[in-house]
Amino acid sequence: FLYPEITGYFLSSLRFLYDIEKNPLILDLGEKISNWLIQLFDTHGGIIQGIYSSVPQNLSYSFDTSICAKGILDFYQISKNEKNLDFGKKLVSELELFIENDGTFRPLKNLRSNQFEESKKLWYKQKGCLHIKCAMPFFQLYEINKNKDLLKKGCDICDTYSKFQNPDGSFSLHLEKNTINLHTLCYAVEGLLYGYN
């Protein structure tokens, strides 16, 4: 099972490690990983959920795409390889297609039909507070290129917290639901803290 989302997290971890120890092996590993993500995107037309037994999934999730965008931009910040910056911009542009007018995210796109979808059967196939974390690559790219449109989009995404926030301050997993999920609540808080910073 190959899982692109965790690959994005790994690229972010490499930046953390490189900041501690300027080991050139970290850069070599990061280049191989970023090249794999670029090839995956070019082959499938998006950041797919995963590959099971050599069979790729044809669904691209906004959340996974944002984690890969963040990882690629993190790696760019240590590698200074413009190819990674260009791919990070491409992923952020792809993310913009998932954003609804109210700042919430459509959860997934079927790459076969080129249609956005949502399903009430699985928590991650619905709009949720977890998508507030998708603001992070918008803020990060803004820090790199100072494009104020990116800053505004990141803020608009974070402002969706009020759609999910309960009277006690917690965040509901989905719109107009009472279910609280610690995992997704942490994602929402992470996106808000990143935006605040």
Predicted regions and their residues:
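Glycan-recognition and catalytic cores of secretory/periplasmic carbohydrate-active enzymes
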Residues: F1-N197
